[in-house]
Curated annotation (Swiss-Prot):
Top EC category: transferase
Protein name: Sulfate adenylyltransferase subunit 2
Keyword Electron transport part of the UniProt annotation: no
GO process annotations (BP): hydrogen sulfide biosynthetic process; sulfate assimilation
UniProt organism field: Xanthomonas oryzae pv. oryzae (strain PXO99A)
Signal peptide: none
Length: 302
């Protein structure tokens, strides 16, 4: 009997599930990083599929910067309750003590303390030896050269020149004392693949990905949403309601929206088919002087 060929989404799904099961089998204490974005939503769906009907043996870890969109936090808690996964939330206590924010300390310092240092704290406190993330190679040039199994030294630093070859679907999971691994099951997916899979599998995502009238101000060539009263308005600034959506989600003062009328999955996919810009165009941290993604990853970033 000849089986019908797998679609490209079926092949990507099978590869990702294989990687998730490989992580569960090879590592002592793996964890999945859950940022609440679309890629994390796909990863959670794949995790549930990989170990169904059992509860996934891998907990979720959310690094909370205290500046995420309110809709993201509500969605995070709702999905954890719906799926029954083991969700752990970490906030860098040092950052809280210093009251670090993107407003008072700037994007680079805020990202380093609340994201990078917060992540390293959580991994060390939890004793995790593998952290699964939703990064994809099509997102950014430094991620394009990262392996599926990306090894980090005892200080969680990434050396792009000291990575192991990966032959076909064979992964070397052996680590040296103190070494850990970041694992990226969505490495070979594109942004369009992610949206097509969300559509096919009916995966819930944060409503911020869909266009709606939202209060925004224009800053540095981007529309910044006024999500709460903590965002100080510049002289002469007045929030205006515009139909916008987000292609990527992070801390709200550092995440630019795009003007759009795409308020359904079908409309988002149609918009994606003609888009000529990167999904990370709205990440203000990427445009800061000296804030290359590779340098942040070398220092321990996702």
């Amino acid at each position: 009997m000849t089986l019908p060929p797998l679609s490209h989404l079926d092949r990507l799904e099978a590869e990702s599930i294989h990687i998730l099961r490989e992580v569960a089998a090879e590592f002592r204490a793996p964890v999945m990083l859950y940022s609440v974005g679309k890629d994390s939503s796909v990863l959670l769906h794949l995790l549930l599929k990989a170990f169904a009907p059992s509860r996934p043996p891998i907990p979720l870890l959310h690094i909370d910067t205290r500046w995420k969109f309110r809709e993201m936090i509500a969605f995070r808690d709702r999905r954890a309750a719906e799926t029954g996964v083991d969700l752990r939330v970490h906030i860098n206590p040092d950052g809280v003590a210093q009251d670090v924010s993107p407003i008072s300390h700037g994007a680079a310092v805020h990202t380093d303390i609340m994201k990078t240092q917060g992540l390293k704290q959580a991994l060390e406190q939890g004793g995790f030896d593998a952290a699964i993330g939703g990064a994809r190679r099509d997102e950014e040039k430094s991620r394009a050269k990262e392996r599926v199994f990306s090894f980090r030294n005892a200080r969680h630093r990434w050396d792009p020149k000291n990575q192991r070859p990966e032959l076909w679907n064979l992964y070397n999971a052996r680590t040296k004392p103190g070494e850990s691994v970041r694992v990226f099951p969505l490495s070979n997916w594109t942004e369009l693949d992610v949206w097509l899979y969300i559509y096919r599998e009916k995966i819930p995502v944060v409503p911020l990905y869909f266009a709606a009238p939202r209060p925004v101000v224009a800053r540095d060539g981007a529309w910044i949403m006024v999500d709460d009263a903590r965002l100080p308005l510049h002289p002469g600034e007045t929030p205006q309601l515009r139909s916008v959506r987000f292609r990527t989600l992070g801390c709200y003062p550092l995440t630019g929206a795009i003007e759009s009328s795409a308020d359904t999955l079908e409309a988002v996919i149609a918009e994606m088919l003609v888009s000529t810009s990167s999904e990370r165009q709205g990440r203000m941290i990427d445009h800061a002087p000296g804030a290359s993604m590779e340098q942040k990853k070398v220092e321990g970033y996702f």
